[in-house]
Amino acid sequence: MAKLTILIALVAALVLVVHTSAFQSSKQSCKRQLQQVNLRHCENHIAQRIQQQQEEEEDHALKLRGIKHVILRHRSSQEYSEESEELDQCCEQLNELNSQRCQCRALQQIYESQSEQCEGSQQEQQLEQELEKLPRTCGFGPLRRCDVNPDEE
């Protein structure tokens, strides 16, 4: 009986060591992948989305105040094409990351770099919302247990 207990303890310890080693390896692999991937397209896409939202809110506020001659902001087909291209390239880059955990870390990195440029908490909220929508927009569904703002408590 004592030998069986020792054997079970050894097997459990071995499983724990293998699991820990695999986790560390995957963590290092993600770090390498994040260094190799260019998240600029995602940053550009998110910045464009926030800019569009602000313009729409400004236009709506002017309309509510009774200003009837609002200058309508028309985006050209070239602008739509550029936005679409940024999104496509962003999705491609995120898709190259081999795990949801790594994709989440990429979104956190984007948040960290973009939040410094936000002017106020409303823009930070928009940034967070856009980053949370990005995986679904790219077609790989929401990331489970991913808080794009790691500083938020």
From Swiss-Prot:
Disulfide bonds join 30-102, 42-90, 91-138, 91-138, 104-146. GO terms for molecular function: nutrient reservoir activity. Its main location: endoplasmic reticulum. InterPro entries: Bifun_inhib/LTP/seed_sf, Bifunc_inhib/LTP/seed_store, Napin/2SS/CON. Gene3D superfamilies: Plant lipid-transfer and hydrophobic proteins. Expressed in developing cotyledons (at protein level). It comes from the Eukaryota. Residues 1-22 form the signal peptide. It is found in: Endoplasmic reticulum. Keywords: Allergen, Disulfide bond, Endoplasmic reticulum, Signal. Belongs to the 2S seed storage albumins family. PANTHER family: 2S SEED STORAGE PROTEIN 1-RELATED. Heterodimer of a small chain and a large chain; disulfide-linked. This is Conglutin delta 2.
